[in-house]
Amino acid sequence: MAKVLVVEDNPANMTLATFLLESVGHTVLKARDAETGVGLARSERPDLILMDIQLPGMDGLSATGILKADAETRDIPVIALTALAMKGDEERIRAAGCDGYIAKPLSYKDFLETIARDIDKRGTGARTDIPALKI
């Protein structure tokens, strides 16, 4: 299974992302702000980073830029978590260095398919099938 860093300041979104990731066996690292997320990415070297765009203090796009400029973290895929759905937002997100994005509110299937695809690209050997979620 993969180690996934979730950088999200909204407690409900953090709880949901953690639940979904852990339900398929991933280990979740949590950060509530960009600065903590950058530090955890450098120290823990996760297989994937889920980065909220709208964070207090430094925003998620700035944090992604820092990670992509660092030789130690630039190869870690960063997926933006965003409620932004305006024209041009995807281009702005990708220009900042994000490898993809997931729109909020989170959809179980879309969320885990995106995670599985990006983990599989990295070659971690993590399980990439999406089991039925039993609640």
Regions found by a protein language model. Give the residues of each.
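Short acidic/polar segment at the start of the alpha1 helix of CheY-like receiver
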Residues: N10-M14
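Charged docking surfaces used in two-component/phosphorelay signaling
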Residues: T15-S23
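Active-site residues of response regulator receiver
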Residues: D52, T82
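The feature encodes the CheY-like receiver
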Residues: P56-D59, R74, M86, K104
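The C-terminal output helix
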Residues: A116-A132
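C-terminal output helix
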Residues: L106-I115
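Conserved acidic carboxylate
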Residues: E8, R32
